[in-house]
């Protein structure tokens, strides 16, 4: 069965400079997927021409005249940018022309737009940003990672339900364990919201492990870790910074002299395997222990997220992305201008 995905081609810090090459690469590896690139046709076509590669019949362009900027408020995006690439991509899902949408755009605007257009399932107040993070034991689902800065105990319970459902569908684990991120494992720790959420989780049908601490995220203590969006986002960005530092330090040490360069060459297979283990498994849908991309199967519909949020500074995986300005805003990549 062919899966159709609508891609917000203008989203992210670079826009079409990343999304279009990545889309072309993706189609080369996934013959059972169709992509709809949503955005400004001229910018998309110019990028396709620059790539100078045969155009797949599974790639189409859908026009959208507006772009949601990274500093647009969710309210402004909803009210004033109804023809944005983000909004149109999500509309295609609602209309049944696509089964899912992908965007690397403004997080707040994306969550607000998706909630407004697609709604939430009964019993769920707010959507949450979830991610599968690598751990010592495989991967764990962590949510919320930034969609909801302030949460009620009831919403944290809902996040637990969503996370457990997601990781069951992705990994095939039955009765996954759910932990509540806290400053200590003892029941007396945490603020009132966390304590009340723990009580709700404990009395639910979920396999509630109890409170977990920050170090448990990567130890793989539980299958699902629940937290509010503020704490989750700080934890995620801290992890990204640490990973960047470790990578940079390794590069410096291996490049110190001829002997260390030769050592790096000898260690290359180990380093590649190490990097592979750390790569996010979030898009590797698993069924029967194997990634769905190898099986040509679509995730079960009732457990399938309808849209994906990508990192705003995400880059194409193959050749390095050149310095470019965003075609919709004319601005260089935020936070990494001049970087190669």
From Swiss-Prot:
Top-level taxon: Bacteria
GO MF terms held by the record: phosphate:acyl-[acyl carrier protein] acyltransferase activity
Subcellular compartments: Cytoplasm
Reactions that this protein is recorded to catalyse: a fatty acyl-[ACP] + phosphate = an acyl phosphate + holo-[ACP]
Coarse class of the protein's main subcellular location: cytoplasm
Listed EC numbers: 2.3.1.274
Subunit: Homodimer. Probably interacts with PlsY.
Family: Belongs to the PlsX family.
Identification of the protein by name: Phosphate acyltransferase
Organism field: Laribacter hongkongensis (strain HLHK9)
């Amino acid at each position: 069965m062919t899966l159709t995905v609508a891609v917000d081609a203008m989203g992210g810090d670079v826009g079409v400079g990343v999304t279009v090459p990545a889309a072309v690469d993706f189609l080369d590896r996934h013959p059972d997927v169709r992509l709809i690139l949503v955005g400004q046709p001229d910018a998309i076509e110019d990028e396709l021409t620059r790539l100078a590669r045969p155009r797949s019949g599974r790639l189409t362009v859908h026009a959208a005249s507006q772009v949601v900027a990274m500093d647009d408020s969710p309210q402004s995006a909803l009210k004033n940018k109804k023809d944005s690439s983000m909004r149109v991509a999500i509309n295609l899902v609602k209309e049944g022309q696509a089964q899912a949408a992908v965007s690397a755009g403004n997080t707040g605007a994306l969550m607000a737009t998706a909630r407004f257009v697609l709604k939430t399932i009964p019993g769920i107040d707010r959507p949450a940003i979830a991610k599968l993070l690598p751990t010592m034991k495989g991967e764990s689902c962590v949510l919320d990672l930034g969609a909801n800065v302030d949460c009620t105990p009831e919403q944290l319970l809902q996040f637990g339900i969503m996370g457990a459902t997601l990781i069951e569908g992705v990994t095939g684990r039955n009765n996954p364990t759910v932990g509540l991120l806290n400053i200590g494992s003892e029941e007396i720790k945490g603020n009132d919201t966390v304590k009340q959420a723990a009580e709700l989780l404990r009395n639910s049908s979920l396999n509630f492990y109890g409170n977990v601490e920050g170090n448990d995220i990567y130890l793989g203590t539980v299958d699902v870790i629940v937290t509010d969006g503020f704490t989750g986002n700080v934890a995620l960005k801290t992890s990204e910074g640490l990973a960047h530092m470790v990578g940079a330090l390794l590069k410096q040490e291996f490049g110190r002299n001829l002997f260390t360069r030769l050592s790096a060459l000898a260690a290359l297979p180990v380093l590649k395997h190490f990097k592979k283990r750390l790569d996010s498994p979030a898009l590797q849908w698993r069924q029967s222990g194997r990634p769905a991309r190898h099986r040509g199967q679509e995730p079960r519909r009732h457990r399938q997220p309808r849209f994906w949020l990508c990192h705003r500074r995400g880059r194409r995986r193959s050749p390095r992305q050149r310095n470019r300005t965003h075609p919709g805003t004319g601005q260089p990549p935020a936070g990494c201008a001049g970087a190669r």
